[in-house]
């Protein structure tokens, strides 16, 4: 039994014969992108590169970003969000499974009116966490200041993209807030819930 990423036939425009490419490359060529893991620098750079390349290739054709992510690192997540705002094509975001933490931040960054959740998807928002638990006092204070700046940035993006008041978003980010697809729609994180 083969293990790994499946290969599918793909014929490039103007070519007679199809070549075998892995399924993700085939889907990328159709402008379908996937965030199906924890957000880190590697996946962030891959998605940023794909979005920039595909927008250069055709800046009128929308991109579709499917999200099933438990969250991850803040800076790589913000980089994905910023790129989505920068590229010319609209970026549709589709939550399937779970969009938690930075996954939900990327989800809310989709083009407004083009953010979707599957009916059984879950969304979770909370405040960013620190990684310096054993740091020296000076480093810890600097880390805390930076964390407060990041929290403010993330909160303001949620306020802007959801239409919710600052006090509501700030209160929700105090703890882990899990939502169903319809609750995420009511919260303004997604615009549509797919029909079963």
Curated annotation (Swiss-Prot):
GO terms (BP aspect): protein quality control for misfolded or incompletely synthesized proteins
Database matches in InterPro entries: ClpP (IPR001907), ClpP/crotonase-like_dom_sf (IPR029045), ClpP/TepA (IPR023562), ClpP_His_AS (IPR033135), ClpP_Ser_AS (IPR018215)
GO molecular function list: ATP-dependent peptidase activity; ATPase binding; serine-type endopeptidase activity
Major localization listed first in the record, in broad terms: plastid
SUPFAM superfamilies attached to this UniProt entry: ClpP/crotonase
Domain of life assignment: Eukaryota
Subunit text: Component of the chloroplastic Clp protease core complex.
Protein name in UniProt: ATP-dependent Clp protease proteolytic subunit
Source organism per UniProt: Eucalyptus globulus subsp. globulus (Tasmanian blue gum)
Lineage, top ranks: Eukaryota, Viridiplantae, Streptophyta, Embryophyta, Tracheophyta
